[in-house]
Amino acid sequence: MYYKLVLSHYSKTSTLINITLIKHLINILRERMIQEIKNFIYKYYIEPAEKGTGYNIVQEITYGIILALALYLFYKALRKLNINIDEKFAIPGIVFTVLIALMRALVDCGYIERSFLTITPGIVFLIGGFFILTILTTGLVFKEKYYKASAVIGLILLLYFLFVFLQHITHLEAILYVGILVGIFYYLVKFLDKTLKLNIIQSKIDDYVVIGQLIDASATTIGIGVYGYWEQHPIPRFLMETFGVYAFIPFKLLIILLALYILNKEVEDENIKNIIKLCIMALGLAPGLRDLFRTVMGV
């Protein structure tokens, strides 16, 4: 009997020890997992922003997913308000894209304090969120004239920062260099599209896409080739290191024209087609203008 009691006590004690040990191991694993997650976030998201080392593949994929999700939800809200994604919608879209680019450049020159909300992607979330709120609010209040009200709101902010920008100009000729490249390649595309009857450029929004992406490619090329800047994004950086800086413009142009060709041929819904196109435009116009503004300010 005594032996059974001792054995029972030993068994209970052993069970308690095992449970305590398991809990301890779980806590260790949980703490280690949390620390690994923190290290991952710091390594791939925070550290590159703090040190200005450029973007990495993990960031590109993450921000791409966030952009796609935000775009989908925004599109659904627009359709509920019966707002069509057309040339009118593009007007405030362009204004706010320029605003993001100019503010980001003013962060680089030190006028705006550097923080998560004033650098990419934080500034895109901030101004992009304000743009979405502006469009939805003016859509409710002004109905079909929403785009005028939205553009005016964006212009008020833009004019203030533009005044600041004008006080920091050091390389005004950079605008001419970029403008010449954009003009040459844009009219070359229009000429070939018409002469060869490719029918790739079908609307003003298609023009905006080509011009926006050409501004990005041209500003990058001039910034690196003439003024000694470097490319932050890994894929363009690899291409320029492999094929040369000036090969980036025709390469990017081919990709954009192929994207437009596929969209115009395969996507029937005009609203879906146009919101994708405007997104492509903004992805070129925003970084392109930022690079150009930086170059002009000598930052």
Swiss-Prot record:
GO terms for cellular component: plasma membrane. InterPro entries: DUF63. The chain crosses the membrane at residues 54-74, 89-109, 122-142, 149-169, 172-192, 208-228, 243-263. Keywords: Cell membrane, Membrane, Transmembrane, Transmembrane helix. It is a multi-pass membrane protein. The keyword tRNA processing does not apply. It is found in: Cell membrane. Pfam families: DUF63. PANTHER family: DUF63 DOMAIN-CONTAINING PROTEIN (PTHR40700:SF1), HYPOTHETICAL MEMBRANE PROTEIN, CONSERVED, DUF63 FAMILY (PTHR40700). This is Uncharacterized protein MJ0440. It comes from Methanocaldococcus jannaschii (strain ATCC 43067 / DSM 2661 / JAL-1 / JCM 10045 / NBRC 100440) (Methanococcus jannaschii). The lineage of its organism: Archaea, Methanobacteriati, Methanobacteriota, Methanomada group, Methanococci.
